[in-house]
Amino acid sequence: MHEASLAGGILKLVEDAARREAFQRVTVLRLEVGQLAGVELRALKFALEAIAPGTALDGARLEFEEPAGQAWCMACSQTVPLAARGMACTGCGSYQLQPTGGTELRVMDMLVADE
């Protein structure tokens, strides 16, 4: 479950920001996790909630945005939806696809408190 290590990295980003910006805790953390990022959202949420106690994330509401997968087909030169890696182009059936969207994994923003 690599989501646990991803959660650790996210916590490190938050803790570093808390030290740098002098805030005590995060009340809302918004993450963008694309459909093609290879991340199981439920597992990531579980991992973040498991490591949050005693940190700046303790009690934070976690919000996720999940951008749809999208790819450029090199065979038919079209942008097509892509539900999962390894799928064929919905236009021509080719497998020569270059993902162009839905691969994101990033902290979008956070609402913080100084208390």
UniProtKB/Swiss-Prot annotation:
Keywords assigned: Metal-binding, Nickel, Zinc
Binding site for Zn(2+): C73, C76, C89, C92
Coiled-coil regions listed: none
GO biological process: protein maturation; protein modification process
Keyword Nucleotide-binding belongs to the record: no
GO molecular function list: nickel cation binding; zinc ion binding
Annotated binding of Ni(2+), by residue: H2
InterPro entries for the chain: Hydgase_Ni_incorp_HypA/HybF_CS, HypA/HybF
Family per similarity comment: Belongs to the HypA/HybF family.
Entry function: Involved in the maturation of [NiFe] hydrogenases. Required for nickel insertion into the metal center of the hydrogenase.
Name of the protein in its database record: Hydrogenase maturation factor HypA
Species of provenance: Polaromonas naphthalenivorans (strain CJ2)
